[in-house]
């Protein structure tokens, strides 16, 4: 019997969560990949840390998998953000080897201009995740015909989002 490696764990998680909600899993994979590319471009973290943060990015909406809310992704990404953030934080903190990074999930919907009110060793990555998450959410909504103000991300720079992740997103390939 072979040892399970991180690639196997990723595949198991994706296949399992995809059976519950393909839409949420697709969003999670896009956000995780975007976060990976931003951190890779930033070149400030070890590959091991980038992989851990990418897994957190993929699991950032794990709290949505409570059966009564999983089908309402857009509502929980735009309006009711704290319930799934708290559930996701608890999942990561108590049921995963990434417990030291659970606060990233808890705060991934916190406005950037409120970061000074909390203590976390991961606020920089949290800011990157928040941008990647919102960017994919608005991109998906725009594709469905919902009008998304083109200047939203510029208007919200350093209010809702840190300017740094937007800079990284625009430059990372």
Question: Where in this protein do the model-derived segments appear?
Answer:
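Histidine/acidic-rich helix-loop-helix segments that form or flank divalent-metal centers
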Residues: 51-57, 92, 98-145, 149-173
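Acidic/His-rich, divalent-metal-binding segments that scaffold phosphate/diphosphate chemistry
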Residues: 1-99, 117-122, 140, 173
């Amino acid at each position: 019997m072979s040892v399970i490696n991180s690639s196997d764990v990723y595949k198991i998680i994706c296949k399992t969560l995809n059976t519950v909600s393909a839409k949420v899993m697709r969003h999670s994979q896009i956000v995780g990949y975007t976060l990976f590319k931003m951190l890779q471009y930033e070149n400030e973290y070890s590959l091991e840390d980038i992989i851990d943060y990418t897994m957190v990015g993929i699991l950032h909406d794990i709290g949505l998998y409570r059966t009564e809310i999983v089908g309402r992704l857009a509502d929980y990404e735009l309006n009711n953000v704290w319930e799934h953030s708290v559930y996701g934080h608890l999942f990561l903190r108590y049921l995963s080897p990434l417990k030291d990074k659970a606060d990233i999930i808890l705060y991934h919907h916190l406005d950037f201009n409120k970061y000074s009110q909390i203590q976390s060793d991961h606020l920089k990555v949290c800011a990157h995740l928040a941008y990647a998450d919102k960017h994919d959410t608005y991109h998906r909504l725009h594709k469905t015909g919902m009008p998304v103000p083109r200047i939203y991300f510029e208007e919200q720079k350093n209010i809702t989002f840190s300017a740094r992740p937007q800079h990284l997103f625009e430059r990372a390939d």
